[in-house]
Amino acid sequence: MRAQRHRCLTGRSALLLAGLLCAATADSAWFRTAEQQAADQFEDGEYSEAAEGFSDTYRRGVALYRAGRYTEAGNAFENVEREEVKADALYNLGNTRYKLSDFEGAVDAYEDSL
């Protein structure tokens, strides 16, 4: 009787564990941050959606640029504060200004990126 009860508990535990694992993988988006979800959207080519989820101004600018939202991308690149991407942001600012036919502004941004 005791062995049968042990097998029953082991079987129930295995079923419970399997159910929890399935639920966790099915709804793993629940456990991901907005930044992680935005990165997934960016990888899927959903650039406008990704831009809304990024809190980092550089990443937001890149997503907006890829979405063709050049004015907003330029604003994001102008507000980048992280030193490790500042030169890249200025270069990308030059690209956005070029796309907006602001050629003088593009040259200024390119020079500032050096």
Segments and roles (model prediction):
Residues M1-L9:
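N-terminal secretory signal peptides that target proteins for export/translocation
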Residues L9-A18:
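Sec-dependent N-terminal signal peptides
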Residues L21-A26:
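N-terminal signal peptide c-region/cleavage motif recognized by signal peptidases
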Residues A29-L114:
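Alpha-helical protein-protein interaction scaffolds
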